[in-house]
């Protein structure tokens, strides 16, 4: 079996350690919660990942994970306890303790039943580079054993062991239990859950039911109880819930958009189908009208074929009825034209009469002039003859006029 070695990362710097402790203090309500269920464990895991992101934001060159940050805090806490135990042994078990760092004091100040450590400046200040180097050297050494054969590899069967050079801490990730060797006499105590061990790292005498007032209880199935609905003091809990809600809303909107797209396509297909149905309806309507016209045409042809004699009889009777009426009308029309011609002829005769009258007067004047040169007997004879001729002519014209226009 071939062992694959991983390159060891660099130690945590002073700024990374200080940032780590500050972020843990901000999230202590979640990290050190004594409730154990799926929801709390998930919230703890996300809290450690957020702390790792804050540490990586410093830009020290190493990308820390949530597990590495968690292990670093455990090592730092164990180192502080070891120094405190050593100081107790050297001082003969007196109540005087060596002063710890300011960040350790700030974390320990949150407890109720343990007094705070001394606040004076000391050589154990975390800002001292020597102490930081000493704490960094006591970091856990990671050894990962992997099998080369892929058939013999199983996901949950790999083991990760962490050995501490000072305390002899051994972590078995598969069994999820931690063994501590606090003294050289090999006294061991076992904690079944790793998350519960975190609650014992910081001294805290509060019971399970003595949680912060702002932190609502979480029931067995991971749902918030309706007893305490006060807003959380820490905003990251609300942020996590809002992120999950936004993700669900985003998925719902995506599904809704797909549904609307399918509905739009369905409506388009339905519109096309209706358009084809309208065209088919119009075509059938035109065909119906054409058949109606053909039917009327055939009916007329049948009627003309069956009743030709009736039509002929009707035409003859109509002619016989209209014939006498036409003759009378023609007669009246001819009479009217005849009267019109007679009237014109009378006008011509009247014009002739006037003309003759003028001629008579002229002749009378001429005779009057010739009386002086012709004897009286001859003149009298000629005048009498002319008067007789004129009288006969005038009487003839008058008789003709009376015969043409009676009563005039």
Curated annotation (Swiss-Prot):
Spans traversing the lipid bilayer: none
Any matching Pfam family: Myb_DNA-bind_5
Protein name per its UniProtKB record: Myb/SANT-like DNA-binding domain-containing protein 4
Organism name: Xenopus tropicalis (Western clawed frog)
PANTHER family listed in its UniProt record: MYB/SANT-LIKE DNA-BINDING DOMAIN-CONTAINING PROTEIN 4, MYB_SANT-LIKE DNA-BINDING DOMAIN-CONTAINING PROTEIN 4
Coiled coil: 236-367
Taxonomic superkingdom: Eukaryota
Name of the gene: msantd4
Annotated Myb-like domain residues: 4-77
Entry keywords, A to Z: Coiled coil
């Amino acid at each position: 079996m071939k062992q694959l070695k991983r390159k060891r990362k660099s130690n945590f710097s002073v700024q990374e350690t200080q940032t780590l402790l500050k972020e843990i203090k901000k999230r202590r309500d979640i990290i050190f919660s004594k409730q154990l269920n799926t929801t709390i464990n998930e919230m703890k895991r996300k809290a450690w990942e957020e702390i790792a992101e804050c540490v990586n934001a410093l830009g020290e060159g190493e990308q820390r994970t949530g597990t590495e940050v968690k292990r670093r805090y455990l090592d730092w806490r164990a180192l502080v306890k070891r120094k405190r135990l050593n100081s107790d042994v050297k001082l003969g078990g007196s109540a005087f303790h060596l002063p710890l760092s300011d960040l350790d004091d700030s974390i320990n100040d949150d407890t109720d039943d343990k007094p705070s450590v001394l606040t004076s400046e000391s050589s154990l200040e975390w800002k001292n580079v020597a102490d930081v180097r000493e704490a960094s050297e006591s970091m856990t050494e990671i050894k990962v054993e992997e099998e080369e054969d892929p058939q013999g590899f199983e996901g949950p069967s790999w083991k990760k062991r962490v050995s501490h050079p000072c305390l002899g801490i051994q972590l078995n990730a598969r069994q999820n239990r931690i063994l501590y060797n606090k003294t050289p006499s090999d006294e061991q105590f076992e904690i079944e859950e790793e998350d519960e061990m975190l609650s014992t790292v910081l001294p805290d005498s509060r019971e399970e039911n003595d949680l912060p007032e702002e932190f609502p209880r979480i029931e067995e199935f991971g749902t918030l109880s309706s007893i305490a609905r006060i807003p959380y003091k820490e905003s990251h809990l609300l942020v996590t819930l809002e992120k999950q809600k936004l993700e669900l809303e985003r998925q719902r909107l995506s599904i809704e958009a797909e549904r609307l797209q399918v509905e739009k396509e369905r409506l388009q297909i339905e519109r096309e189908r209706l358009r084809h149905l309208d065209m088919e309806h119009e075509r059938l309507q035109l065909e119906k009208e054409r058949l109606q016209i053909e039917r009327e045409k055939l009916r007329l042809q049948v009627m003309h074929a069956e009743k030709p004699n009736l039509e002929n009889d009707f035409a003859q009777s109509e002619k016989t009825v209209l014939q006498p009426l036409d003759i009378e009308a023609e007669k009246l029309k001819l009479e009217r034209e005849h009267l019109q011609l007679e009237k014109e002829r009378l006008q011509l005769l009247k014009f002739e009469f006037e003309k003759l009258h003028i001629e008579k007067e002229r002749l009378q004047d001429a005779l009057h002039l010739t009386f002086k040169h012709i004897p009286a007997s001859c003149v009298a004879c000629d005048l009498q003859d002319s008067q007789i001729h004129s009288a006969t002519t005038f009487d003839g014209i008058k008789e003709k006029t009376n015969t043409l226009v009676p009563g005039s």
